[in-house]
């Protein structure tokens, strides 16, 4: 079986976050591994602390604003939820729309919400 790494990476690049999540779960089940990060043992002595840049962000919907229907559509597009679930999320604001996503994905989701007329922020 020929393996084309570039084709594989292209396929991964075209997948949605939900599809990638399903892929990770399938790989964990198939090979009996976990995608959880391994923690390194504590270092002894005086080691300078390195300030780490935040890599995971939450997109928080603060309120729907005047354009509630547009915000519900944006939430559905971002999360893949059904109409009722998206409406419940918007009605229950403040709510996390996306959790633990990369900065690029979080900024894209935030832009969609703001463009729809919602008040939202990154945490």
From Swiss-Prot:
- Source domain of life is Bacteria
Q: Which GO terms describe its biological process?
A: translation
The UniProt entry, under InterPro entries, shows: Ribosomal_bL12, Ribosomal_bL12_C, Ribosomal_bL12_C/ClpS-like, Ribosomal_bL12_oligo, Ribosomal_bL12_oligo_N_sf
A Pfam family of this chain: Ribosomal_L12_N
Q: Which Gene3D superfamilies match?
A: 3.30.1390.10, Single helix bin
Has the keyword Ribonucleoprotein been applied to this entry? yes
Q: List the disulfide bonds.
A: none
Q: Which GO terms of the cellular component aspect does the record hold? A: cytosolic large ribosomal subunit
Keywords from the named record: Ribonucleoprotein, Ribosomal protein
Q: What CDD domains does this protein's entry cite? A: Ribosomal_L7_L12 (cd00387)
Name a GO molecular-function annotation.
mRNA binding
Q: How is this protein organized at the quaternary level? A: Homodimer. Part of the ribosomal stalk of the 50S ribosomal subunit. Forms a multimeric L10(L12)X complex, where L10 forms an elongated spine to which 2 to 4 L12 dimers bind in a sequential fashion. Binds GTP-bound translation factors.
Q: Identify its protein family.
A: Belongs to the bacterial ribosomal protein bL12 family.
Which HAMAP family does this entry report, sorted A to Z?
A: Ribosomal_bL12
Relate the protein's function as given in its record: Forms part of the ribosomal stalk which helps the ribosome interact with GTP-bound translation factors. Is thus essential for accurate translation.
Name listed for the protein in its UniProt record: Large ribosomal subunit protein bL12
| Origin species | Albidiferax ferrireducens (strain ATCC BAA-621 / DSM 15236 / T118) (Rhodoferax ferrireducens)
Task: Supply the gene name.
Answer: rplL
């Amino acid at each position: 079986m020929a393996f084309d790494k570039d084709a594989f990476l292209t396929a991964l690049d075209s997948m949605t976050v939900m599809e990638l999540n399903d892929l990770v779960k399938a790989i964990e089940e198939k090979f009996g591994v976990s995608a959880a990060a391994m923690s390194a043992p504590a270092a002894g002595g005086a080691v300078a602390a390195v300030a780490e840049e935040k890599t995971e962000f939450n997109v928080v919907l603060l309120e729907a604003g005047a354009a509630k229907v547009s915000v519900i559509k944006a939430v559905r597009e971002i999360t893949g939820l059904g109409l009722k679930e998206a409406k419940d999320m918007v009605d229950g604001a403040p709510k996390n729309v996306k959790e633990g996503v990369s900065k690029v994905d979080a900024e894209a989701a935030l832009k969609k919400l703001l463009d729809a007329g919602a008040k939202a922020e990154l945490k």
